[in-house]
Amino acid sequence: MTYANGASQSDKNGNLLTETDALGNKVQYAYTPEGWLESITRADGTVLTFEYDKTGSLLVQNVGDGQTVESSYNEIGMVTEVSSAEGTIVYQYNGQGYLVSVTNVNGDKVSYTYDAYGNRTSMTYPDGRMVSYTYDAMNRMTSVTGLDGDVTRYTYDAAGRRIETASSTLTTSYRYDSVGNLLTQATSGASEIAFSYSYNKNGYITGEVRTEGGKTTESTYAYDALGQLTSFLQSTGYEEQYAYDKAGNMTEKVLTGTDGIETALKMSYNKGNQLTTMVNGKDKIAYTYDKNGSMVTKVLTSQAYGKLTDAYAYNALDQLTEYVGYDGYQQEFTYDANGMRLSKSEVGNGNRSTLEELLRGNIAGLPEIVELAQSQTNANGADAPTGLEWATTEYLYDLTQEYYQVISETTTSSGGASSTTAYAYGLERIAAFTSDSRTSYVYDGRGSVAQAITMPVAGEAVSSALPDVSVQVQSFSYTAFGEQMGNVKVSGFSYNAEAYDAATGMLNLRARQYEPALNRFSQKDIYPPNLLITYSFNAYLFTFNSPISFVDADGLQASSLSKVLSSIGNTVQKVVGVVGGGIKKVVTAIVGEKVVNTVVSIVKSAAKTVSRVVQNVAIAAASWTSNDPKTIEIIKAAQEEINALDQSDPEYVKKATAIFIAACELAASHVKEQAARQKEHEEFMFNMYGFEKEEVRIMDKIRVGLKAFDPGLTDD
């Protein structure tokens, strides 16, 4: 099948053999006789190879740059160790196959306990501190006891929607319309802030009213027929307007400051949908990419600043490994065998403006430009930062959440000074803890951090009427695509509750880096186009150009905000798989659809133990549902049935397997019923990408087949 932006070839078994993008960059794939992915030859010539045992478990991965990742398994096929040049990660499980501990490459161990239904009941940090959790009869989280002993409680309505979050210092209430859209959200206690929302007939947010400190700010959003955001207007007078080409690339962004002054930015792209220039009058930034589609340079040519260059470097898995700024500011990154960022090292002054900020200049309502000192030059011969200390931050993660989360970060300077921040999570990130303070997070209705409330650990109780003078409240607001507003920008968890780096303007979304000022990712999505999702044909788009009503937590797939909200309270447990992080992205991209088509038959032959069954139930829940409540309910019911079986019964595995297969079939039936709702994508694809009618009909067959898990479906 040929796409508007390139072509791909598959063998008779449906295995992807070659993929060529519109720029002529070709990726090749090879498979073992069993059909397992054996090698990937990337566009830049890098070869990734994979070795398996006789059961198909991945043993050795050559991940490029001369680096390998080796995996070990226990007798029932669950990964116990993953080793790379950075060190070894060790996993331990209980009898039901649930992950009970992870020891990272630095020797830091995180431990977990569970109830009979697989809900995590506690997490113990390396220093011995613990966060504990309770659940109701529907397996919804009802309380979290944090690192300081403070309890956060959750209450739900009859429809399963969260209606209150309450701790000793903050209480947030939620109200919804008849279809589950959030209408109001109000927080009281240590701080007072409220939000209300309005929607169009498609469920997209059209308005937000924020009330804080007696001040009300209204934001309105408009969309085109394809659901792309076309304007963002605040009652402060700040405004952004957007125009797009047929591929969804933003071609113009007009920013109007609160002072009424307009700035028009024009963008151009190559046929691979890569941003090549951003222009403001006579000034411009030129962007270049490597053959794998990752941005490697930005060059600003400006009347005010001359020529300034940023440079980026990546490993063979397209993970950012180095940033060298126009002013000599530098960052370096390392990753573990799971592809998770292990450390960030930086040197130089991080209080700086990005090239995009310098290009557009000061705009009333956005952070002020940090002017360059005369000694600062471009990265081509930049003044190297001499006499400055490097600072290295190491990260520790919780792997049991749907999207792995940082639970601790320790920053150490080359001079030896060190500080640690730990994080506690419930239905979202609750608070950050240092040696002498606690910072609680308050969110807007979209899930972005609206306030960070910091108070001394040993401080007096906070009055809901008049906060103690030692309490510091920091407020955040954002443009539609996620740039921080106000006079200054701050690094930390912010837009969509993800980690923002103010020095580089990047949001770390795990698999890729998102740049709000560009409204897009700086790295190509390695997943092939998904025929169910129109805009996946453009590998750089963020949330289908609808960032107010969609979120992207992993840099791979956007989900509607309503779907994310509807999943609140569900606690499906994910067990660590045999492939992690960056390489998991590569492998899943190739075998994902095939696995979906054959999952039931695979399970029938591969489910040899209850631990494998439980693991597959968890994986199935994560892979099929995209947080669909009905399918999660089916999977949870299967887990309960399996947990209720007598493990000493000789027929135990057979019975557990039968329960799982029945859940597969029931979930598939449910998803098949929803296939008709995807019909609108056919029209979108035809209108936007010019597919012929026969191609559209083939896509429809694939769509229905995928959702029905039809093992016999072929492209012809």
What positions do the PLM features span?
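Low-complexity, glycine/serine/proline-rich disordered segments
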Residues: 219, 361-368, 375-377, 460-463, ...
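Aromatic-rich beta-strand edge motifs centered on tyrosine
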Residues: 1-18, 26-36, 47-57, 68-78, ...
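Beta-turn initiation residues at beta-strand->coil junctions
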Residues: 1-5, 18-24, 39-45, 60-66, ...
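Conserved short loop/turn motifs at secondary-structure junctions
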Residues: 331, 497, 527-530
